[in-house]
């Protein structure tokens, strides 16, 4: 994947390269661009999580799959800043991988992880996870996660009030009690469903009783 270095999200000007001819064509069309990036084209799932660290301790974390994005067709990558459809996942390997990444960064930087750390990940064709972004804040779906049992918002307030995380329940690999999904669009409240099986029921589409 070639992408112009324009300091914007969404892969503006990006092109998937399948052969050397595509590469040469991109360079010809964008001859006035002094810098560009080359990255692997990842075909797997978009994964994400939210994790809480306190003075180097990994306190709790939970994961999800960002299956579709709001206004995806406006970006060449089909990835925008907000999730439209997501699945909540009970896959421990996601949080384990992210915690390993944080431990690596702690060692390299010589500082302990502290606060909310939110990962964006993408799987390659073999299902191996690659880090695409790490945010040092709550994500937009933090409130939705709270509704389905993973409430970092309440935990954050408790830490601010207590001055420590002694009263925060340790839960490094949170498991949701149901296969929840959520749907969200611009300027509307998110819709939370207990599973996506409803989409497989033809009676729902045709309002058959």
Task: For the regions a language model picked out, list residue spans one by one.
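Structured catalytic cores of enzymes that bind and process phosphorylated ligands/cofactors
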Residues: 29-31
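ATP-grasp fold ATP-binding core
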Residues: 1-10, 33-44
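A short acidic, often aromatic-flanked loop/helix-cap motif at beta-alpha or helix-coil junctions
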Residues: 2, 22-23
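Short, solvent-exposed polar/charged micro-motifs at secondary-structure junctions
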Residues: 5-8, 46-51, 123, 127-128
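Short beta-strand or tight-loop elements
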Residues: 34, 45-47, 114-117
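ATP-dependent carboxylate activation and anion-phosphoryl transfer catalytic cores
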Residues: 90-209
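ATP-dependent carboxylate/phosphate-activation module, predominantly the ATP-grasp catalytic core
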Residues: 12-21, 40-46, 50-106, 135-160
């Amino acid at each position: 994947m070639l992408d112009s270095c324009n300091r914007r999200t969404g892969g503006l000007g990006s092109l998937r390269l399948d052969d050397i001819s595509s590469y040469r064509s991109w360079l010809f069309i964008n001859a006035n661009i002094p810098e560009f990036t080359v990255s692997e084209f990842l075909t797997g799932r978009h994964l994400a999580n939210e994790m809480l660290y306190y003075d180097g301790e990994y306190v709790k974390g939970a994961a999800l799959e960002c299956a579709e994005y709001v206004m995806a067709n406006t970006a060449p990558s089909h990835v925008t800043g907000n999730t439209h459809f997501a699945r909540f996942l009970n896959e421990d390997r996601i949080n384990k991988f992210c915690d390993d990444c944080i431990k690596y960064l702690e060692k390299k930087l010589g500082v302990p992880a502290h606060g909310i750390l939110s990962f964006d990940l993408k799987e390659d064709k073999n299902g191996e996870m690659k880090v695409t972004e790490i945010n040092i804040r709550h994500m937009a779906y933090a409130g939705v996660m709270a509704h389905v049992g993973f409430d970092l918002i309440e935990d954050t307030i408790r830490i601010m009030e207590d001055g420590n995380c002694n009263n925060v329940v340790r839960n490094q690999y949170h498991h949701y009690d149901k296969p929840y999904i959520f749907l969200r669009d611009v300027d509307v409240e998110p819709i939370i469903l207990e599973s996506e099986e409803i989409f497989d029921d033809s009676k729902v589409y045709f309002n058959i009783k």
